[in-house]
UniProtKB/Swiss-Prot annotation:
Organism name: Saccharomonospora viridis (strain ATCC 15386 / DSM 43017 / JCM 3036 / CCUG 5913 / NBRC 12207 / NCIMB 9602 / P101)
Job description of the protein: Catalyzes the deacetylation of 1D-myo-inositol 2-acetamido-2-deoxy-alpha-D-glucopyranoside (GlcNAc-Ins) in the mycothiol biosynthesis pathway.
Origin: domain of life: Bacteria
Pfam families: PIG-L
Protein name: 1D-myo-inositol 2-acetamido-2-deoxy-alpha-D-glucopyranoside deacetylase
Name of the top EC class for this enzyme: hydrolase
Amino acid sequence: MLFVHAHPDDESITTGGTIARYSAEGAHVTVVTCTLGEEGEIIPAELEQLGAWAGDQLGGYRIGELAEAGVALGWSEHRFLGGPGRWRDSGMAGVESNEHPRAFVRGAMSEQVEQLLAVFDEVRPEVVVTYDPNGGYGHPDHIRAHRVATAAVERSEGVRRLFYTVSSREATTRGLAALRRDERVPFRVPADEELPTTPDADITTRVDISAYREVKFAALRAHRTQITVGPDCFALSNGIAQPVPTTEFFVLARGPKEGADTDLFGGL
């Protein structure tokens, strides 16, 4: 199986438990990251000079964080799309970094799809996981990762299922309610509608990660420039609490539905 993500930390936030579970169960798990996350904000004050606005060394630092997360999750192998540094974090929509010559969103789709197809040819995944058409929350790099992954899947005869990673509206609502009752939570707990979610009626697949939740937390901690972990939750640099359910959620976008309710490989 193969996961296509935009930046270091996305793999742990959205699919960390699933990566850990299938890795532990013996699947060959490949994670492809499209950029180094150079435009990310930085939580530790002592590392702020790594930022794109200063030393511009954050991307290299995040390679190390990603490697540490990979050790925790146990994936088989990792690739950067086109090699480390080929594509740069574009930043959020409408910012100056969108125009960087190596910005992921400025790159030729044809080149990016060919680069991903080259990985497909090597590892021959049966299952591919990426974001939904909105990239989960609208980040330009997430949207481009979706487009590249879906285009590559359409041209690959070996991929039998394509899934989008999503957040369950019901699970998020329950998780936030629990965080509001927990006085240990050091972050601002948002209103339900503040976090992007998917209606549960649209969710096709629910993967139980309860046995791997602590592994997911270990991977989240590895991304220390981007993430602070709290009790049953984490926060990005905005300090907004996000719950970590015991299930990860997916929408089957392509391939047979039979057997896919709780297992990305079910019925294959």
